[in-house]
């Protein structure tokens, strides 16, 4: 895949770029794997904004992805590589030998006609195969990693993401996560071998505000451009900065201030992420 650029026939097209979509082989064909999700637009069940700068965006259907990879011992063939509007990586439709069809995240190098399988142990270290962490060799790059056995993959699922198995300690496996954090995860958790595909996504340039509106992202207003009633940075004659450490609209320090609460799982973190 490559990044496609456009001729600057309008100002917004000058720097705009997209990822080449020649790897997509088909449109969605399995209706039972498509569902309509309600457009929350950043609102909670009371209709109040709990996540600012969000809107519905373009109309789209959610693809049900197999994050658990719990179909053990049944080989499956990759039938199609498809676009997913809800994520920045591609998805692969796998047709299993027993006729079952499931979507998985497409690892880099996985193509139509390839065979993938999930098992507790004993599989080849090939992109798309899934095993328990304790049975994957040290040094292997993995993605779609569970944090609790049977819950489904939660870590390293976006385009180009991966974690590396660094070692083992008792019932835990030591992973280096995409952020650089070193963390212990139970060896009973499942993970998929390989790097998530569509790595070039990180290099695209949105180019114009309209593309972000289609993605459901609304404009952000600076606090210093508001009135004092709306934001702690608001008001003043002319352009004035914050009188002290920058804060959120609710007075919480921001821009580098640590807000993460301590959790019992902190003991599993060997070293924090690199900034």
From Swiss-Prot:
InterPro entries tied to this protein: NA-bd_OB-fold, Rib_uL2_dom2, Ribosomal_uL2, Ribosomal_uL2_bac/org-type, Ribosomal_uL2_C, Ribosomal_uL2_CS, Ribosomal_uL2_dom3, Ribosomal_uL2_RNA-bd_dom
Pfam family, one: Ribosomal_L2_C
GO MF terms, alphabetically ordered: rRNA binding; structural constituent of ribosome; transferase activity
Region Disordered, annotated ranges: 212-275
Gene Ontology CC entries for this record: large ribosomal subunit
Keywords assigned by UniProt, alphabetized: Ribonucleoprotein, Ribosomal protein, RNA-binding, rRNA-binding
Functional description taken from the UniProt entry: One of the primary rRNA binding proteins. Required for association of the 30S and 50S subunits to form the 70S ribosome, for tRNA binding and peptide bond formation. It has been suggested to have peptidyltransferase activity; this is somewhat controversial. Makes several contacts with the 16S rRNA in the 70S ribosome.
Similarity annotation: Belongs to the universal ribosomal protein uL2 family.
Assembly and binders: Part of the 50S ribosomal subunit. Forms a bridge to the 30S subunit in the 70S ribosome.
PANTHER family: LARGE RIBOSOMAL SUBUNIT PROTEIN UL2M, RIBOSOMAL PROTEIN L2
Protein name from the UniProt record: Large ribosomal subunit protein uL2
Organism: Nitratiruptor sp. (strain SB155-2)
The encoding gene: rplB
């Amino acid at each position: 895949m490559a990044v496609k650029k456009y001729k600057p026939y309008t100002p917004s097209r000058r720097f705009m770029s997209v990822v080449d979509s020649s790897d997509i082989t088909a449109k969605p064909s399995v209706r039972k794997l498509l569902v309509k999700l309600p457009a929350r637009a950043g609102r909670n069940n009371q209709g109040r904004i709990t996540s600012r700068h969000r809107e519905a965006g373009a109309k789209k259907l959610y693809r049900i992805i197999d994050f658990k990879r719990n179909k053990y011992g049944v080989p499956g063939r990759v039938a199609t590589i498809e676009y997913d509007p809800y994520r920045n990586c591609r998805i692969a439709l796998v047709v299993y030998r027993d006729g079952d069809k499931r979507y998985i995240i497409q690892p880099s190098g996985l193509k139509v006609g390839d065979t993938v399988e999930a098992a507790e142990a004993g599989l080849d270290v090939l992109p798309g195969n899934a095993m328990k962490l304790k049975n994957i060799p040290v040094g292997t790059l993995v993605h779609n990693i569970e944090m609790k056995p049977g819950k489904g993959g939660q870590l390293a699922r976006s385009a180009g993401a991966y974690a590396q198995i660094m070692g083992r300690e008792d019932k835990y496996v030591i992973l280096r996560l995409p952020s650089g954090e070193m963390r212990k995860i139970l060896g009973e958790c499942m993970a998929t071998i390989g790097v998530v595909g569509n790595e070039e996504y990180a290099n695209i340039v949105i180019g114009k505000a309209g593309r972000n509106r289609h993605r459901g992202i609304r404009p952000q207003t600076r606090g210093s451009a508001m009135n004092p009633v709306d934001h702690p940075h608001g008001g003043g004659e002319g352009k004035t900065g914050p009188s002290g450490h920058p804060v959120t609209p609710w007075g919480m320090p921001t821009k580098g201030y640590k807000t993460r609460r301590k959790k019992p799982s902190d003991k599993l973190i060997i070293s924090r992420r690199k900034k």
